[in-house]
C-alpha cells in the first residue's frame, strides 16, 4: 500500500483526536489517521515485516525491533510509540507481525482522552500499565480499566467508543493492541477482567486465548497472550499452542534473553517456524508474550 492510500484510509478509525474530560467534546488536531485496516484476502500469507534500520535485525526466523526504531508521535495530550505503521507513522516494511496489526505504547495526559470514534472487524485489546481509563461505548458499557485489568473489544459489524483519563493530576500509560479476527462481521462485544498480578510472578500468566472458557479474556482469533514478572535469573520454556503460529515478545521492563537473543526494555522480538522458546530474565523483567497466526484464514 502506498503512503497516500494509507493516509486516505485515515480519517476516523484510530480515534487519535483529543477530548477533554470536562466538555467531552472532540478537538480536531488535523492528524491524518486510518479509517480502516482491512484483513488480507482469504488464506493469503501475512508473514512478518521489519523496518530497514541498523537497530532492527532480521535473522533466519526472528526479527528484532529495538525500542528506538518505533514510530514516535507526540501530540501533547497523547505520546504514542508505534511498533507497526499507524496514523502518521507509515513504513511499508513494518505493517504487522502475522495477524498482530497494532502495538501502541501510549501515554495519555491528565484530563484528556480519545474522543468517540468507530471500529469494525478488529479485535482490540487494552492493557493498562499505570493509572485509570474510563471507557464508554455504543453497547452501553461505562466502566473504568486500571493497572491489573485487561480489556477486549470485538468490533465486528461496528462499534463506537471513547477512552478518557479521568485523573486530573497524572497520566495514564497503557498498551493498545489490534489483532485481525478470524471471523468478520461478528456481533460486537466488550469484555474486561481484573487479573491477579501475583499469578505472573516468576511464571507465565495466560491473559487471552481463543476460548471463552479458558483463562483470561477471549478473542475471535487463534491467539494466546501471557504476561510475566520475572526476578533476575528466572527461566522458562514457552511451547507454542498452534503449529504455524509466531510469537511476538514485547519487553516492558528489564533485560531478557530469548533463544540467545537479548532484548532490552521496550524492545520487541518476533520469532516463527519453531516449536518452543527459552526465556531467561537477565535482570528483573516484565514482559508480554503474544502468540499469533502468521497467516489469515
Give the label of every model feature segment.
Residues 73-118, 122-123, 174, 181, ...:
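A short glycine-rich, His/Asp/Glu-containing loop-to-beta-strand
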Residues 155-185, 273-297:
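Ligand-binding loop in jelly-roll beta-barrel domains
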Amino acid at each position: 500500500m502506498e503512503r497516500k492510500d494509507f493516509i486516505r484510509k485515515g480519517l476516523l478509525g484510530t480515534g487519535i483526536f483529543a477530548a477533554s474530560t470536562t466538555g467531552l467534546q472532540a478537538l480536531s488536531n488535523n492528524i491524518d489517521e486510518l479509517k480502516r485496516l482491512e484483513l488480507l484476502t482469504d488464506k493469503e500469507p501475512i508473514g512478518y515485516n521489519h523496518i530497514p534500520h541498523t537497530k532492527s535485525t532480521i535473522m533466519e526466523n526472528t526479527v528484532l525491533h529495538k525500542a528506538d526504531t518505533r514510530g514516535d508521535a507526540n501530540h501533547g495530550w497523547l505520546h504514542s510509540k508505534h511498533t507497526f505503521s499507524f496514523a502518521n507513522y507509515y513504513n511499508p516494511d513494518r505493517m504487522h507481525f502475522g495477524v498482530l496489526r497494532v502495538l501502541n505504547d501510549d501515554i495519555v495526559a491528565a484530563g484528556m482522552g480519545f474522543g468517540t470514534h468507530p471500529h469494525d472487524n478488529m479485535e482490540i485489546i487494552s492493557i493498562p500499565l499505570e493509572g485509570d481509563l474510563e471507557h464508554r461505548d455504543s453497547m452501553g458499557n461505562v466502566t473504568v480499566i486500571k493497572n491489573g485489568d485487561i480489556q477486549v473489544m470485538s468490533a465486528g459489524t461496528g462499534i463506537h467508543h471513547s477512552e478518557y483519563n479521568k485523573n486530573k493530576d497524572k497520566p495514564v500509560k497503557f498498551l493498545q493492541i489490534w489483532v485481525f479476527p478470524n471471523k468478520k462481521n461478528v456481533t460486537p462485544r466488550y469484555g474486561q477482567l481484573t487479573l491477579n498480578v501475583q499469578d505472573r510472578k516468576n511464571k507465565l500468566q495466560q491473559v487471552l486465548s481463543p476460548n471463552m472458557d479458558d483463562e483470561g479474556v477471549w478473542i475471535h482469533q487463534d491467539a494466546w497472550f501471557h504476561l510475566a514478572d520475572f526476578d533476575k535469573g528466572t527461566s522458562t520454556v514457552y511451547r507454542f499452542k498452534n503449529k504455524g503460529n509466531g510469537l511476538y515478545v514485547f519487553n516492558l521492563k528489564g533485560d531478557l534473553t530469548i533463544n540467545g537473543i537479548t532484548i532490552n526494555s521496550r524492545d520487541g522480538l518476533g520469532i516463527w517456524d519453531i516449536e518452543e522458546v527459552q526465556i531467561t530474565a537477565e535482570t528483573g523483567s516484565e514482559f508480554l508474550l503474544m502468540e499469533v497466526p502468521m497467516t489469515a484464514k
